[in-house]
Amino acid sequence: MPNENAEVRTANTEAGRPQRKENGRRPQFKRREPKEFDSVVVSINRVSKTVKGGRRMRFAALVVVGDHKGRIGFGMGKATEVPDAIRKAEEAANKNVFRCNLVEGTRTVPHSVKVTHGSSTVFLAPAAPGTGVIAGGAVRNILELAGVSDVLSKVIGSRTAVNVVSATLEALKSMRTVEEVAKIRDKKVAEIR
């Protein structure tokens, strides 16, 4: 008889079910692994759809994730409840992560850049060490999550969160280090500087 129970336990484990302890209970909680990325909710927007019975409310969340080491991403999620929208946005952001080029040592952007998305234009420029992140709103959140410590920025035009975030991330994607530019032009780094 005890052998049959042992076979059942191994079958349950192989099927993906948790193995029962001696007292017959399942383990209660598993420890969560530390998150790979930190996340910031940039905006939560309540949207409504008018139907025959009245208005149907939903929420749209915009979330930015980053590891403070040059990896950054953003995502949007929609749901009938705010926590569900945030969770969906985080999942989407984790799928859209990319690495941005930063100047080693000073942790600033390699060169100035101006990117337009929709009616929002974002300008980023390198800054001297000790300057800090001179930015506001969504741009500050993105730059801090990316690990930028010294940068100057300006948002021109519309301050719509989605457009500002898209323009800022496009600006970070377009950054090229001196070494990359030298390789593209078939020149030495000293000739570029």
What spans do the regions from the language model cover?
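Ribosome-associated RNA-binding proteins
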Residues: 1-193
